Amino acid sequence: MRLNGEISSGEEEEEEKQTGTTTFSSQKVVVGYALTSKKKKSFLQPSFTGLARNRGINFVAIDLNKPLPEQGPFDIILHKLSGEVWREIIEDYREKHPEVTVLDPPDAIQHLHNRQSMLQDVLDLNLSDCHGKVGVPRQLVITKEKDPSSIPYEVTKAGMKLPLVAKPLVVDGTAKSHELFLAYDEFSLSAVEPPLVLQEFVNHGGLLFKIYIVGETIKVVRRFSLPNISKRELSKVAGVFRFPRVSCAAASADDADLDPNIAEHPPRPLLERLARELRHRLGLHLFNIDMIREYGTKDVFYVIDINYFPGYGKMPGYEHVFTDFLLSLVESKCSNKKLAA
C-alpha cells in the first residue's frame, strides 16, 4: 500500500535506529508518525527529537506497507498525509483504539481542506468584548462548474471591491494549493482556473501575524506580506499577478525595524479567546491562524487562512513547546484513568 506522501521503508528503519536509544525518563511515550518526507525533515529536527528522547518520548515511523493495528503499541499518533485511503485507515484505527490519542481526527482536519468552510467558524464567533474585533474579509466562492469567463460578472453581481485575492478553494497540501493571485480588475480573473475563493484585499501594512496553536499554547510570529495598495495604484494597474506562498520563513519580520502601530501583536486576551474558541469548534489541537490588522486601525483584525499541522519548525522554541504538549496529553490520559478507576 502506497499513499500520497509515502515514507520509504529505509527511512522507517533509520528512524527506528535513531529512536532506539536509552532515555533518561522512567516512563516512555511512543509517538507513531505518518508524515511526508518533507514534513518529517522540517518537523523532526535533531534538536527536537533529541530533547524529546531525553524526556522519554520515542518517535517511531508508521510503516504504510503494513496494517496499522499490527504496529505499535502507540500512545500518540501524529499524522499529515493526504488521500482518502489514509483517512479511512486512521479513522478506523481511531474508533477501534480509543486509548491512543490521534492528532488530529481526520474529519476535523478535512474541515480545513476547504477555504470556504475553514473560515466559517471565525464568522460565527463573537469576540467583541476581547480588546478587539476579528472578522473575515468579504469573499466569494467560484465553483469548479463555473466558466472562467463568467467570473467578472459574478464579481460585479456580488458587489466585490477591488483588488481581489484569489486562492484555490481546496487545500490539499501541495504548493499549488497555497498559491495566490492578486487581481487589480475583475476581467483578468478569467485567466484563473476555478474552483476559487475570492477575498477582498485588506490593506494591512505589509505584515501578517502567524499564530501557532499547540494544544493550549499560543505563539505569534510576524511575517512580511503583500504591501498596501493605494487607490492611485489601483486606477493605474490592471491584470492578475501570481504570488508564491507569501508567509515563508525567509520573510520573517520579527527582527525588522517596523512601525510600532503595524508591528504590535494582537492583544493577548483576544488571541487566547480566539484560539480557545477555534480549538473547540474545529476539534483540533494543531493548527495556525494567518491574521492581519487593518491598516490605520489598532484593534480590527481579519483571519485570512487556517492551516492544519503547519510548519512548526519555523516557530521559535517549538522543540520545548511540542515536547511539553505531548507529555501533557499522556499525563492527562493517565489522570483520567485514575479518576475512572
UniProtKB/Swiss-Prot annotation:
Residues 233-259 are annotated as: Catalytic specificity elements (CSE). Kinase that can phosphorylate various inositol polyphosphate such as Ins(3,4,5,6)P4, Ins(3,4,6)P3 and Ins(1,3,4)P3. May participate in an inositol lipid-independent pathway of InsP6 synthesis. Mg(2+) 2 binds at residues 305, 307. Its EC number is 2.7.1.134, 2.7.1.159. It comes from Glycine max. ATP binds at residues 115, 167, 178, 199, 202, 225, 304-305, 307. This is Inositol-tetrakisphosphate 1-kinase 4. Coiled coil: none annotated. Mg(2+) 1 binds at residues 290, 305.
